[in-house]
Amino acid sequence: ELSVFSTWAWQWSNEGDMLYTTLFLSTAEIKDEIRPHVLWQTKLDGKVSMKPVPVTNHVTGEKELFVQDDRHTVYLINDVGRVLWKLPLGQQINSEVYQVDLFKNGKLQYLFSTPDKMYLIDRNGNAAGRFPVAFKGKCEQGISVYDYDNNRNYRIFVPCENREVYLYGLDGKPVEGWNPQKTDKPVVSKVQHFRVADKDYIVFADRYRFYILDRKGKERVRVSSVFDLKPHTDVYLTRKGGQPVLVFAGKGGQVHVVNFSGQTETSRVEGLSDRFEMNIVDWDGNGNGDVLFTDGNRVLVTRLDGTPLFEKKMEAKTLGFPYVYRFSAKDVRVGLTDPEQNQLFLLSADGKLSKGFP
């Protein structure tokens, strides 16, 4: 019974074509112990090729898993590991899998994209509405979906290689009134929406420039600085000195901080390869963002100005993206994977591995 545990979390992992779900449990009596327990495993037709996505069954309220394999087949798996349906797509999903309410009746669908199309699938595995919708150019960054006012009037951003950023509604049609200028280069980040001080900001980057627009596609904040960004750049909203800022990484270990007046600061973390992964975490609980890196078998944390806070070499070959799990206000842990050795790590801020890991 879950009620006896003070903290619990789910983790999904895979080994080849096997998908596992694990439950981590922490009791008040054993505060520093998080116990992993494999609940079920399911065999797929191919190797898992994306991080499994927990989705809600709108009929029962239970959690299910949406996942894709390397044969480009997607699956919906219920809470005991049974495959409810599978659907071949022909391409790899490159966006998040969003649950949306097309008919505003409480019944949810799955919205996602591949480089050539976006799909809307109901919980029975059937296409919904006017979907799939073919893009006007390759969309390598994937779609982003936002419900500005929580009224189920969804907006779907589609950044394409033709330097256009398109905006669609859930009816599969372009939204009238959205008219941004072409970017200088193809977009290298997902399009993101942030609301700061009751203002909306549409944010994305190309190889050298950073764009901050309003909901109509007009420039809201001018960022004059020039950057050198990676092909897939993540942008984070966090705080520095108590003020909201946007943070993203460039090549050569550069960390760029942009405030909402368009001013920029850049620091450099020495010794990083161009294969590093980055996330944002409040490492020391002071209310400001810190930068969390994985690079090879190393985990590093620095302040936004580059001041080092933490570094540890793991017994791993190559660490993947560092996921942040907050079990309580003072208990932040980093979830790490080593795909080459099929290992999972859960690391606390004091550098210790949680019991049962890897």
For the regions a protein language model found, what residue spans apply to each?
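Extracytoplasmic/lumenal domain signature
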Residues: 7-16, 21-358
